[in-house]
Every structure is written in C-alpha cells, then in structure tokens.
Amino acid sequence: MTDTPGNPGGSTQAAHPCGSGPSDGSVPAIHAIIPAGGAGTRLWPLSRRHRPKFLLDLTGAGHSLLQDTVERLAPVTATTTVVTGVAHIAAVADQLPQVPRENLLAEPSPRDSMAAIGLAAAVIAHRHGRDAVVGSFAADHTVADRTAFAGAVRQAALLAEQGWVVTIGIEATGPSTAFGYIHAGDPTDVPGAPDGRRVLGFTEKPDADTAAAYLATGDYRWNAGMFVVRAGVLLDHLAELRPQLAAGIDAIAAAWDVPEREEVLAERWPALEKIAIDHAIAEPVAAAGGVATVPVSMGWNDVGGFDALTELVAPRSEGPAAGAGVLDSVDSADGADGADGAETVDGSVPEAPRADVRVVGSDGALIASTSGRTVVLLGVPGAVVVDTPDALLVTTPEHSQGVKGVVDALRAAGREDLL
C-alpha cells in the first residue's frame, strides 16, 4: 500500500499529501533522472537510430541537447543518472565525462518511460535511500530561462518532500494541439512552494477548440513530462498500481550493483510492461488527489520537429545566408557520431565538412546541412531544407510533423539503411 503523508499505509485511492516528511525547511537537491531514448523521427534525416537527436547540437550552441540538459540541471542536483539504450551508452559516456559511469544505466530494449524512470528511481533508492527526491527530465528539450527553471524545480522538490508527485507545468504560449494539458486546482499551501497547485487531471492532446477553451480558463498548463517525487513514494505508487512491473523493476535494481546484473536483466527486463509514466502513475494518482504542479514560464521547447527547430535557430544577420537559420554542424564538441558514423584510423570521428549555404529571397528559411555540398535557396521563404550525405528533405514548418510518416513509409519500403 502507498504510504503518503497524512495517509500512512494507505492506498493511492486516498492519497492526500499534507505536510509530513523528512524536510527540515531547506530545499533538497534532487537526484536527476534523464531518460535518453527514442530515434527522434520527426527530425529525420538529421536524427537517426544510431545518432538520435539528444546526441546532436540542434541549437548551434556547440553542445548536444543531452549535454545542455545536464548543464541546466547542475545547480539543483545532487546526482545525475542517465537511462539510455545499449546502442548509445558509449556515446552518452563520451559526451558526459563528468557523470560517473555507474550512473549511466543501459536498458537492453525500449520499454517506455515508466520502466526507464522506475529503474533509475529504484537504483537511486538502493544507493541513497527511499527518501531521496528524484526528478525526471527529458534529454532532448531546451529551456531559455534557466533561473525560472531552477526556481520551479526547487519548489517541486519541497512539494515532493511532503509526499506529492509533482509535475512542472509549462505556461502555454498558445492553444497547441501538440501537447497534453495539466488541469490545475487550488494552491497546495506548502511553505517555500508558493506556486504549487493541486492537479485535478491530465488531458491528452486536444483539438484546437478544446485547447483554446482550456487556456481561456487560466487553469491549464502544457504537460512537458517533468516529474519530481520522493523515490519511495514513486515506487510505492507503482507497487500498488502496477505490481508486476514494480516487482520486475525492484528485482533488477536490487541486482544492479552486483555481479548478477546481466543475468537478472536478461530474465526480467523483456517481461516488463511497456507503459508511460503518465498512464502508470500521474493520471491515477492525480485522480486520487496526490499530484501537484508548479507552473512556470521558462522558454521551453520540446524540439519535437522542424517547426520547433525554426524557433530555436536564429536567422543569420549577415553573409550569404542572411535572413535564414543555418545549422552547418549538428555534432556536439564531444562524443557525437560523425555524419556517416565512420571513424579515422586513430578511432576518432571525423568532423563533418561545413556547408556553403547561400540564400536569396528566402527569409525565414531553415537549412541544416551535413553533406558539405553547396546549398542555395532562391525564392522559397520559410522553407526547411535538410541535406545529409544520403538523404535530402525539403518541407515547411507547417508540414514538418508529417516527417514521422515519411520515416514510417521508408521503413515499410525496407529502407532501414536510411533510418
């Protein structure tokens, strides 16, 4: 049974956090969990299975989205744990030399976010205790206002100490149909967390009219999938709501730091239920009154497609590509694969050649090139052109969400070499 403040030994159906817990009034540093998975198919052909978007520099800042996430979390974290696929563990280690190798958890196959986050939380609970506050943050989002982000996370940590499952709610900039929504209710009245509000429920991606109606109330925020919670609270909720999944995760976590890890992983991991943390924990616990949100405006971008990327890459102000946004190198300074994954004789990855990009009458266009070819845009304002050594994509921001369908069609046609 889930043991929550105000409901010791009680069930999720009666979970009402109300102010007990280990807090001494100080803000706890969280143990960050970064799930780094997925192929980022909406950013094909830049993002591929062997080189997914979280390993790429998609903002022109000289570091990958993953590196940016770790750097952003540093002021509020005690430890950082990254969960990624076995195919990417070496690249992740190369990009994050500051993260201890034992904090990089390799999952044998994708089992969705609950398995990844649950495993990390269970390993952290074994290493640091069940009262450790954990926070899960995607590896491939960007945040412009780091001060606002850190403030929201600190408030969330104080709420989590009191037994809440906390989600960071993004102040919506418009009635988007691309995101889920959080319905916020009354204040939580937790000292040190003045913005905390009870969550009345979660809604999947609505249609445009419904999204506009939500925003008109002032009580809805975008759901960015960021969760902060005590490790023990998360695992207790999981044990009650998904007991088989919880048992499998617990068995794997118990063996993680002992020689039997691989044997237990091989036996238990493939049988874990594939389910998102939203469905496994957030929605049912919110229905029982146990979820809070901290709303924040922080310039968040999920980098979910080329339409989102056009908002991140500023147009050049001078030179032959003036007026257009240009990404002429997407490999971060450390660790990302080269354009074709080839290595030199000394084992290093060669730098992709810089593109020669020229723009005429094409203001607002976005050009991403890793081929080294000369790319010229003439009279196509707002176009999106992605030129790689083996694939060329031309689209517009308005149609860019359809890229995933293109990838699905290529897979159906047997073009695995392009994915």
Predicted regions and their residues:
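Conserved beta-strand scaffold positions in the cores of enzyme catalytic domains, especially
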Residues: L55, L104, V165-T167, G290-T293
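Short coil/turn connectors at secondary-structure junctions
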Residues: P28-I30, T77-A78, P100-R101, G129-A132, ...
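Conserved core of the sugar-phosphate nucleotidyltransferase
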Residues: R146-R268, G372, P397
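Conserved N-terminal catalytic core of the sugar/cofactor nucleotidyltransferase
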Residues: T2-I34, T41-R49, F54, T59-A148, ...
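Residue-level signal for inorganic ion chemistry
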Residues: L66, A120, D140, I182, ...
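A short acidic, often aromatic-flanked loop/helix-cap motif at beta-alpha or helix-coil junctions
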Residues: P110-A115, G174-S176, A208-T210, W300-N301
